[in-house]
Amino acid sequence: MKYTRYALLFSLFYALYYLIPLELRALWQPDEVRYAEISREMLVNGNWVVPHFLDLRYFEKPIAGYWINNIGQWLFGSNNFAVRIGSVFSITLSALLVYWLALRLWQQRSTALLSAVVFLTCLLVYGVGSYAVLDPMVTLWLVAAMCSFWLAAQSASRLQKVSGWLLLGLACGMGLMTKGFLALAVPVVAIVPWMIWQRRFKELLLFGPLALVSAALITAPWAISIARQEPDFWHYFFWVEHIQRFAQSDAQHKAPFWYYLPMLLAGALPWVGLLPGALQRAWRERSENSGSLYLLCWTVMPLLFFSLAKGKLPTYILPCFAPLAILLAHHGIKIAGTGSKALKANALINVAFGVIAALAVILVLAPWGLVHHPLYAKSEISKVLLGASAFLFWAAVGLACLVAGAKHWRLAALCPLGLALLAGAVIPDKVIDSKQPQSFISAVDNTLKHSRFVLANEVGLASTLAWELKRSDIQLFDRHGELEYGLSYPDAKGRFINLNDFSRWLSEHRREGSVSLVMKLSDDDQYIDERIPVPDQKYHRGRLVLWYYSQQP
């Protein structure tokens, strides 16, 4: 009976966090609409080998993450829920693996369940895990690699050991096909230090080749197939997407070495008060409990590895939160009955965070705020109140944990619930018009659907148009963006129209049908009306503008 009650409560908890909100939030550009459109095109054209984006070659990522997204759209259709369910599915399987590993380590269901809950409610995990990007998928394979190696390392028989190493290779191979060679590097930097500390390096040399073989076997069919269809894929993917992005001085997303420290602290909310003690406990237990050191290696070593890279994004450290969640849960349970101040500190941090964030919404972002250009307009008072309420709910849960003391410290898992349910309803119109063009496109849907040609000046905007209109022939106007490589192929000629050539291009193509030009305006575009032909219709909302040119004989 008790188990049934817990199962029902967990199901409700999971649905409120990870299922109900998915359809309630508009898709964000460029990331979510990009992956939505790539998978839509794969389902339409049936090519599950070569990624295409707006009918152009798109070699920034391998294929396996798209496969998971494809299945989501195949099962649930073309909607926001279907776009995001691949990420949710991946992060859910990761949580189940976290449960499995914690159970193997501590032999306690309560610790294992709490580890999964901590993982699912860490702010970074929830934010990325309910967002349509590929990081949840690669996290799944890295967590699977972490569990597979532990299975091999603790096996009682040679068969189990061999199976564990083979599973490790399969997980790494799938990670490689999801996000690239980092899926091979991360397990190495996490496992090798632990093996050296345990004086088992010889075992690594003996069984490691099994993992390499299984990784090669699972990746070979696709790797060979795409090399045959697109001979330049591996050159571009390895040198441009890996070497330039992570090592060269002009890498994308450059950030200082310490960049991930604040990301880790913010991402560990609402459990960050337990973080110092959890890491310290893992180090203190390193001799008598090799599992604690193993989790510590999987937390710290990838973090250092990503910190050394030139290019950095918060999503890169998502895999670190799986072992960290187990350490946090283990530490929390250990100190719950000892009168430790860490649980009180964690509750106070949540109260402070919720109150400060609510005050920031009311005093800074609101139309009466202290800044000269508030984020919310005067017509969005309800959004201000909802946003503040979401953070005040966070603070209220923190206060409840503080009052209840060590007995109910696990209630911190409810802190992000207000944000989870209300996030889609509190996005300011300024942000919607810039980053969520779906509502703008819906307003001009009839015009766009009857246009023979549709042009967009940003890749993110173009992908949203393609997704909403269910057509992949959107033309790029004036800016290549991330599709510069795909546009360089001879068969992509005519897919890009330069601003200086637009008048001539328009006069030629209006004979074939009407033309819609959709732009997201920047400061450089303030005089755009003077540089393009006068339209037959114009629709302007926020930073988004539609110019419509009817067909001419």
From Swiss-Prot:
InterPro entries the record matches: ArnT_tfrase (IPR022839), Glyco_trans_39/83 (IPR003342), LipidA_mod_glycosyltrf_83 (IPR050297)
HAMAP family (UniProt xref): ArnT_transfer
Keyword Nucleotide-binding (UniProt): no
Name of the gene: arnT
Family: Belongs to the glycosyltransferase 83 family.
A Pfam family hit: PMT
Protein name: Undecaprenyl phosphate-alpha-4-amino-4-deoxy-L-arabinose arabinosyl transferase
Membrane topology label: Multi-pass membrane protein
EC nos: 2.4.2.43
Transmembrane segments annotated in the record for this chain: 8-28, 81-101, 113-133, 136-156, 176-196, 204-224, 255-275, 289-309, 313-333, 351-371, 384-404, 412-432
Keywords assigned: Cell inner membrane, Cell membrane, Glycosyltransferase, Lipid A biosynthesis, Lipid biosynthesis, Lipid metabolism, Lipopolysaccharide biosynthesis, Membrane, Transferase, Transmembrane, Transmembrane helix
GO molecular function, one term: mannosyltransferase activity
Coiled coil ranges: none
Organism (species): Erwinia tasmaniensis (strain DSM 17950 / CFBP 7177 / CIP 109463 / NCPPB 4357 / Et1/99)
GO biological process, one term: response to iron(III) ion
Catalysed conversion reaction: 4-amino-4-deoxy-alpha-L-arabinopyranosyl di-trans,octa-cis-undecaprenyl phosphate + lipid IVA = lipid IIA + di-trans,octa-cis-undecaprenyl phosphate
Keyword Isomerase in record: no
Compartmental location: Cell inner membrane
A Gene Ontology cellular-component term: plasma membrane
Function: Catalyzes the transfer of the L-Ara4N moiety of the glycolipid undecaprenyl phosphate-alpha-L-Ara4N to lipid A. The modified arabinose is attached to lipid A and is required for resistance to polymyxin and cationic antimicrobial peptides.
Primary localisation category: membrane
Pathway(s) it belongs to: Lipopolysaccharide metabolism; 4-amino-4-deoxy-beta-L-arabinose-lipid A biosynthesis
Top EC class of this enzyme: transferase
